[in-house]
Amino acid sequence: MFDYGLLDDPDGLAAVDVSGLLRAAASAGAQVRSTAGAATDAGLDRLTGERPRALVLVTRPGATAAAAPLLVALLGPSCPVPVVRCEAVPSWTGALDVVLAHTADPGDQELAVGVDRALRRGAQVVLTAPPDGPVAAAAAGRSVLLAPRIDVPPGLVLPRALAAGLLLLDALGLLRVDLDALAGELDSEAERCHPGHESFVNPAKSLTLRMVGRTPLLWGTDTVATAVAAHAATALAAHAGVVAHAAGWHEAAALPALRVVAARGSAEPDVFHDPYLDEEPSGGLPAVRPMLLSVETDPGSVAARRGAIDALPGADPVTAGEELMVAATDPAAAAAAVAVLALRFDLAALYLGLGSGVLGGSAFGGVGLFR
């Protein structure tokens, strides 16, 4: 049972959020700035101008599992360098390659072995990891090691992992970014979603209310938004214990039974509907909440968005804001929209978890599973 009163009770939220999860999530902008500072101190600029044979994104459990798809989506199909996503450092990695990896687990033995092998073969390695343990030892003195400067739970470090990736892409000349501006947008989003702001003016709380008691169907109308949807589904599972379906709109549209559920189950119930006496308006189908996520405004993405809205008029459109809707030819601006949407879903998932009693006190331990 969701506690609706708690959602607009800042003192009550603070009382149940004993681990400071909302505050940790709101540090997204600070995570980005601190990662940029760590990159400067670690000498990431020595990779400036490099054109690797391949860019290897190692997706260990946790933040990089979300950061890597976001980076690939931002690069798009015109990226001049092959981008390889894998769970472990490939055995073929050599002197012509650049490896990017993130872990919150200092004892990740598989990553430590892979990093050591890649470095011995001459690859350039950029690693965000704790400064102690086997992973850091394997990378010591031979890689660009970005140690965390702000302590946040492992399930809320996507801004750090994403910032490290964006910094590397900028150094390689693959994607120009303004991390100061991106951090500023994250600060603004954190302020809009502050626990002290009521639901009708708080984007994250509003998003939470739209998902209470329903299965979210998170469908992206463009490639970048689809990658955000995947992160949102992970955040909902990690912080609220909610199972969601994440996919691109065209992929979801190819699932006929799911489209039927979405079309029938997304309609709002009649105000006079009695759930105990009346037949369910959805015909007994599961209660779902279709959400159409959008980032890009190129003609193809706009057409997909309109087609999705026409097919599912009851679906909720979700964007980072009109000022952050960008053309597909401006992936640097899209990075800010990606970060803002990801943060909004992180905060919404936390509000949902706290309001439903899944989080709070010792219940927070589950977030640590997503490292």
Please give the residue ranges for each predicted region:
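Active-site phosphate/pyrophosphate-binding segments
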Residues: 17-24, 34-43, 50, 170-280, ...
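N-terminal, Lys/Arg-enriched amphipathic/low-complexity engagement segments
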Residues: 14-72
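Glycine-rich phosphate-binding loops that contact phosphosugars or nucleotide phosphates
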Residues: 49-191, 295
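Catalytic-loop motifs flanking and including active-site residues across diverse enzymes
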Residues: 67, 157-164, 228, 232, ...
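Phosphate-moiety recognition in structured ligand-binding domains
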Residues: 1-40, 123-143, 167-170, 177-184, ...
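Short helix-loop-beta junction
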Residues: 70-84, 234-243, 311-317
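Short, highly selective alpha-helical patches that border small-molecule cofactor pockets
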Residues: 25, 68, 72, 111, ...
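A generic structural motif
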Residues: 82-89, 128-129, 242-254, 317-332
